[in-house]
Every structure is written in structure tokens, then in C-alpha cells.
């Protein structure tokens, strides 16, 4: 199996079904973990030198930071609902406790950080929704933790791509630091499909061809994007959801399109 593809496993004692660490991915910044909890099951975490964005993918949970209760977070029944997820920002140096109110799927998105920022619930109205692309390139984006919102390293966004459409397209990359033109960001894609027996395709490739892999993605898979362009295609009949986590030396999302395919942006 490709080293860029991480598949889920049965829940362990903590409910974890999938985990990506900087060590397992072979990079320096992004961490990602998915847990599925039964009602009243607890999940704890927090790191001295890493910030975390808790994203309640579906279900609801009571969340506390350093023993301070933030309240009930979440509530949507599926990632395919067109509503914002529940989300909480946890600064580096803080501890969190998640107690499932219902059956729960939660993502823990992490990256390097410094202690001192306040913990907070990310309000649904703060998560801007936008429509990108047109015709069979149309997809629906919700910015959970964009660069306009306070954090040290993390960028978090979710995207719904209708069946038969493309996403992260035309192909773009963000693997080189060029002032004002491109930033260097690692990225994970957490994929869900509806219906769940479906599949999607994601290609990860570089200009020089040193990296060029096309991956068949199933429900619950993660694709690692250490570098290169990374377009996604959803077959007819299967809607695709993905949660992106990005982080790098600079907290800005500035990308460069593949010049071979940039022409289509000029053709309206």
C-alpha cells in the first residue's frame, strides 16, 4: 500500500480508529487523529508544545479545557449535513476532556504551538461557507480555522464535493516558500463517502515526476500530501467529504496552480 495512504482500523480502548503523527508521516508539523466514542465515553489529550483543533464531525460532546467546562459542542448527524461542525481551539500547554453525549466521531487536528492563547469554542457563524469552482468543478467549503482566526500553526477546513465533480482543482500545490507567491504547508485529507461503499481518486504529483501516485480512496481513509499537486475526483453517485489539516513554517495558505492546467481558470 502507498505510504501516502492511511486506512482506519477497529477502535482501540480510547476509541481511536486512525492516527497520523509527524513521526509516522515523516514530516514536521501536522498531526491528525480520529476517534469514535460511545455515549458517556471519555477522551483526553493535550500537549505542551502543540495546539489542537477538536472538530466534532458528528454527534455532540461536553468539552472541558483545564477543568473548565465549555459546554455541549456539536450536534450534526452527519458530515454530509450542510451545517457547521462543532469545534474547539485548544492552545499548547492545555489539557482537554471530551465526554460523548451521543455516539460521536471526533477529529483531533494538531500542529506546533506556544502556550498562552485562550481556549475557545469556534462559533458556527465564524466558519465562513463558500462555493468554489463552477459546473463539474463546484464544491462547498467551510472554513473551520482559517488564517484570519487566531492560532499558531493550524489551518483547518472541510469540503463537500458532489458526486461527479472534482475538487482541489485545477491542481495546486503549496510545498515551496516563495514570498507572496507560495507557502510551504503539509496537508492531510480525511475522506468520507456517501454512500459509504463508494470510492474516490486522489492524485499526488510533483513537477519533476519524482512523486506521482494516484490513490483509490475509501470511506475513512487519510491521504498525506507532503508535497506536490493533489487534485481529487468523486465518481458519479458518491458524494465526497474531506477534512483538511494544514500547517507549516508560515501560517498562510498561498498556493500555486499547475501551469499546465491553469488555462481553464481563464476560460469562463
Placement of each model-derived feature along the sequence:
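A short glycine-rich, His/Asp/Glu-containing loop-to-beta-strand
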Residues: 11-44, 51, 137-188
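Conserved hydrophobic/aromatic beta-strand scaffold that supports enzyme active sites
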Residues: 32-36, 53, 87-89, 108, ...
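Conserved metal-binding segment of the jelly-roll/cupin
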Residues: 81-101, 111, 216-237
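Short, structured patches in soluble enzyme cores that scaffold and shape functional sites
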Residues: 92, 100, 108-112, 145, ...
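Double-stranded beta-helix
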Residues: 104-143, 205, 243-268
Amino acid at each position: 500500500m502507498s505510504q501516502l495512504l492511511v486506512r482506519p482500523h477497529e477502535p482501540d480502548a480510547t476509541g481511536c480508529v486512525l492516527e497520523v503523527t509527524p513521526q509516522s508521516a515523516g514530516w514536521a508539523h501536522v498531526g491528525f487523529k480520529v476517534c469514535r466514542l460511545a455515549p458517556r465515553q471519555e477522551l483526553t489529550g493535550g500537549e505542551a508544545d502543540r495546539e489542537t483543533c477538536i472538530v466534532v464531525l458528528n454527534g455532540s460532546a461536553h468539552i472541558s479545557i483545564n477543568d473548565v467546562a465549555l459546554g455541549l459542542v456539536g450536534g450534526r448527524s452527519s458530515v454530509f449535513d450542510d451545517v457547521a461542525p462543532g469545534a474547539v481551539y485548544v492552545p499548547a500547554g492545555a489539557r482537554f476532556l471530551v465526554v460523548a453525549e451521543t455516539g460521536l466521531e471526533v477529529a483531533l487536528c494538531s500542529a506546533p504551538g506556544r502556550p498562552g492563547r485562550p481556549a475557545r469554542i469556534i462559533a458556527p457563524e465564524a466558519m465562513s461557507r463558500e462555493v468554489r469552482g463552477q459546473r463539474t468543478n463546484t464544491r462547498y467549503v467551510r472554513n473551520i480555522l482559517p488564517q484570519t482566526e487566531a492560532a499558531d500553526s493550524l489551518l483547518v477546513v472541510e469540503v463537500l464535493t458532489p458526486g461527479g465533480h472534482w475538487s482541489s482543482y485545477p491542481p495546486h500545490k503549496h510545498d515551496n516558500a516563495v514570498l507572496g507567491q507560495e507557502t510551504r504547508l503539509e496537508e492531510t485529507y480525511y475522506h468520507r463517502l456517501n454512500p459509504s461503499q463508494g470510492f474516490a481518486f486522489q492524485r499526488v504529483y510533483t513537477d519533476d515526476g519524482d512523486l506521482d501516485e494516484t490513490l483509490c480512496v475509501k470511506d475513512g481513509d487519510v491521504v498525506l500530501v507532503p508535497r506536490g499537486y493533489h487534485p481529487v475526483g468523486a465518481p458519479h453517485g458518491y458524494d465526497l467529504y474531506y477534512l483538511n489539516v494544514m500547517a507549516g513554517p508560515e501560517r498562510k495558505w498561498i498556493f500555486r496552480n499547475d501551469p499546465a492546467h491553469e488555462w481553464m481558470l481563464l476560460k469562463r
